[in-house]
Amino acid sequence: FTATTARGDGQGLEKVFEEIVYAKTLPELIEQGYLVRLLGYRIGTSADLSRLSGEGLDFAEEELAEAVDIEERNALVARSIQELARDRRTIAFCVTVNHARHLCIALNALGVPAGLVHGTMKSEDRARALADFREGRTIVLTNVGVLTEGFDDPGVSCVAMARPTRNEGLYAQCVGRGTRLSPGKR
């Protein structure tokens, strides 16, 4: 069972499995009440992605970080999260650890309780950050790839894609973190 048919290596599932026995699309799952309806906002920034090179299915990480991890842009993303998400439990996907840290700082500067998780954290620090988020001590959690797959918190009701991507599979994985059903979710 998989929520997305796209693989990071660009291969389709038919390259891995002999037969796909059952398939449902995201719109079908939403229509049938298995996932919440999505409402998307695009926040325009001054980041110029037109000259970025690609690595496989996505932008080159270092170039992307240079283009988007800018104080002015992070402040705009933080204000947008504050205004649009309000009190919603939000996860924000960032390009690098520094980007996640800078966005977390920008959110906290606005009075939005935010934390961060990334793959190089000590496991006990990551567990504490996740517990703070689940228990409401922080309402925004910035991250770098850690919450993309295998993270299941139905209380997440807002996803902020602070890292542009050309990879549809990655985008679907990230957005999918906010589609789980949960009592009172709006």
Annotated model-derived regions:
Residues F1-T5, C94-T96, V144-V146:
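A short beta-strand-to-loop transition that corresponds to the Sensor-1 phosphate-sensing loop
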Residues F1-G40:
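Post-DEXD/H (motif II) to motif III coupling segment of the RecA-like Helicase ATP-binding lobe
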Residues I91, A100-N108, V112-E149:
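Conserved helicase ATPase core of P-loop NTP-dependent helicases/translocases
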Residues E63-L110:
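Conserved strand-helix element at the start of the C-terminal RecA-like helicase core
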Residues P164-Q173, R177-R186:
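Conserved segment of the helicase C-terminal RecA-like domain
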Residues F17-E19, L35-L38, L110-P113, P154-C158, ...:
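Short glycine-/polar-rich loops that comprise or flank the Walker A/P-loop
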Residues E28-A75, N108-P113:
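Inter-lobe coupling/hinge segments of SF2-like helicase ATPases
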Residues G33, V140-V159, V175-R180:
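SF2 helicase motor core recognition
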